[in-house]
Amino acid sequence: MNLITLIIMAMAMTTALYTINTYTTMKPDINKLSPYECGFDPLGNARTPISIQFFLVAILFILFDLEIVLLLPTPWSMNTNPSNTTILLITMLLTILTLGLLYEWLQGGLEWTE
């Protein structure tokens, strides 16, 4: 009996949500047509040039985001199989990323004004 009730409630909820979505009107207003937080015009040309500094910071963000993805499961893997190879690889990865960030900083790639 409970399974039938659950199926009926799911179908009723699906029908109600579909009906609400179908019959509500999409009215564009000034807030929906305005640029979002970034300040770019959403209806403008997609081929506008971007600054090199912005591009470099975006690439650095992606690299350090990838670093977090690679290093986040490390404590769990160290619990199952702690080895010197894992520690060496983590240390090498952090050293390479730190040296790259230091090089970028010394070259002035992180400066917004010139």
From Swiss-Prot:
<dbReference type="GO" id="GO:0031966">
    <property type="term" value="C:mitochondrial membrane"/>
</dbReference>
<dbReference type="InterPro" id="IPR038430">
    <property type="entry name" value="NDAH_ubi_oxred_su3_sf"/>
</dbReference>
<keyword id="KW-0249">Electron transport</keyword>
<keyword id="KW-0472">Membrane</keyword>
<feature type="transmembrane region" description="Helical">
    <location>
        <begin position="52"/>
        <end position="72"/>
    </location>
</feature>
<dbReference type="Pfam" id="PF00507">
    <property type="entry name" value="Oxidored_q4"/>
</dbReference>
<dbReference type="InterPro" id="IPR000440">
    <property type="entry name" value="NADH_UbQ/plastoQ_OxRdtase_su3"/>
</dbReference>
<keyword id="KW-1133">Transmembrane helix</keyword>
<keyword id="KW-0679">Respiratory chain</keyword>
<dbReference type="GO" id="GO:0008137">
    <property type="term" value="F:NADH dehydrogenase (ubiquinone) activity"/>
</dbReference>
<feature type="transmembrane region" description="Helical">
    <location>
        <begin position="86"/>
        <end position="106"/>
    </location>
</feature>
<dbReference type="GO" id="GO:0030964">
    <property type="term" value="C:NADH dehydrogenase complex"/>
</dbReference>
<protein>
    <recommendedName>
        <fullName>NADH-ubiquinone oxidoreductase chain 3</fullName>
        <ecNumber>7.1.1.2</ecNumber>
    </recommendedName>
</protein>
<keyword id="KW-0812">Transmembrane</keyword>
<comment type="similarity">
    <text>Belongs to the complex I subunit 3 family.</text>
</comment>
<feature type="transmembrane region" description="Helical">
    <location>
        <begin position="3"/>
        <end position="23"/>
    </location>
</feature>
<keyword id="KW-0830">Ubiquinone</keyword>
<keyword id="KW-0496">Mitochondrion</keyword>
<keyword id="KW-0813">Transport</keyword>
<comment type="function">
    <text>Core subunit of the mitochondrial membrane respiratory chain NADH dehydrogenase (Complex I) that is believed to belong to the minimal assembly required for catalysis. Complex I functions in the transfer of electrons from NADH to the respiratory chain. The immediate electron acceptor for the enzyme is believed to be ubiquinone.</text>
</comment>
<keyword id="KW-0520">NAD</keyword>
<keyword id="KW-1278">Translocase</keyword>
